[in-house]
Amino acid sequence: MIAAPDRTPLTREFFARPVLDVAPDLLGRVLVRTTPDGPIELRVTEVEAYDGPSDPGSHAYRGRTARNGVMFGPPGHVYVYFTYGMWHCMNLVCGPEGRASAVLLRAGEIIEGAELARTRRLSARNDKELAKGPARLATALEVDRALDGTDACAPEGGPLTLLSGTPVPPDQVRNGPRTGVSGDGGVHPWRFWIDNDPTVSPYRAHTPRRRRT
């Protein structure tokens, strides 16, 4: 008999560790999104680590700005950014305050509230595609910039909470280069995913944009 996922909330101490420890340890954890229409729960299956100002692939690489300020704050908070003029992506701040490390949630399996998630992801061909990719994940969970700075470790709970879930054994975790990261940041094997999980997004190398002529 398979044991039910642990419903104990993750603590701030969990997120206060180095980003390369936190990222693979988030696999199998459960993200609860509480909305006025009901809860949606997602089992994390794919993540990417970004290690602050020392990481050329990180939003914090060039220092603190109005956009990335949450990254420099306490661990356990949510950093949401808007990209390509249409998509949101969700990250979890980790490491010591001021380090500006974060883990991007790239994909997950909707384990509760799939019917609600489907209303937000009408183009998904099946439930495995509901949160297959960071923008799809944020869309399915109705995560946008209004949730930037949310404390996912708040004792009283809130719109976003992480539960202990069922950690993934190390032999089932794979890692490789981060999707779409160019230059020096592209060499780090800091993308982590659950092996053979159908909700994991396909890897795509960085493709330089063509200049208009």
UniProtKB/Swiss-Prot annotation:
UniProt feature coiled coil, ranges: none
CDD domains associated with the record: AAG
InterPro entries with a match to the protein in the record: Formyl_transferase-like_C_sf (IPR011034), MPG (IPR003180), MPG_sf (IPR036995)
Highest taxon in the source lineage: Bacteria
Keyword terms, alphabetized: DNA damage, DNA repair, Hydrolase
EC number: 3.2.2.-
SUPFAM superfamilies noted in UniProt: FMT C-terminal domain-like
Record-level GO BP terms: base-excision repair
Protein name: Putative 3-methyladenine DNA glycosylase
Biological source species: Streptomyces avermitilis (strain ATCC 31267 / DSM 46492 / JCM 5070 / NBRC 14893 / NCIMB 12804 / NRRL 8165 / MA-4680)
